[in-house]
Amino acid sequence: MPSVFTVRALLLDMDGTLVDSGAVVERCWSRFAHRHGLEPAAVLAVVHGRQGHATMAELLPDRPMAENYAENAVMLAEETADLDGVVPVPGAPAFLASLAGLPHALVTSASDGLARARMEASALPLPPVMVTAERVGASKPDPEGFLKGAAELGFAPAECLVFEDAEVGVAAARAGGMPVVGVGPRAAAYGPDALAATLLDVTVTAGPEGLLTVTVG
């Protein structure tokens, strides 16, 4: 049975939800792992969905945060320049096209420059509101980014539907009191309110009084 949500706005994660940047992430973070004597698989298991400095703090708990921020800045520059293999996830172009003129925001752990580069490389339009890493004080799973996105669109958190593929992103939506749709096969393990195998399984219909009907499945 399809899941149906009636909301006023959508809050969208980027990497893994709209954009497939997995090849770049694997290249950059595998180099990080080798630099620090870590197993690449162990690093890649925790990197997804959060800001780089937060991942480094988890992997290198004894290292000063200043060093994490410095290395993260270098890696962000590397990732922004490396767009080889960055493509839209299935259904993303049509999904975003269906949102034209409707309230929606991008809420990503990527920097503004990285987000714009990956969206452009994927030929995807930028949402009217973007909440990027520079605009929050805490990375997902903290709900700050989603709460900021809801506020900037002018809606209460419970009136917004989140789309996420990562465990920390689903947790952030939950912490913010927002319903959440998991996107992609691995999202099922994180307990979203509904699961879309791809964005091809999602339809958004604008109704009266600014209400959006979102059907998943």
Listing of model-derived features with the role each one plays in the protein:
Residues M1-R8, S111-G217:
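Asp-based, Mg2+/Mn2+-dependent phosphohydrolase catalytic module
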Residues P88, V107, A138:
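Residue-level marker of regulatory loop/turn positions in helix-turn-helix DNA-binding domains and
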Residues P103-V107, A121:
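N-terminal-biased segments
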Residues T17-L18, D84, H104, E134-R135, ...:
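A generic structural signal for short
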Residues D20, L106-T108, G182:
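Hydrophobic residues in well-ordered beta-strands that form the structural core
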Residues S3-A94, A100, S111-G113, L124:
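N-terminal helical cap/lid subdomain that shapes the substrate entry/recognition surface
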Residues G101-P103, G177:
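Glycine-centered short loops/turns at secondary-structure junctions
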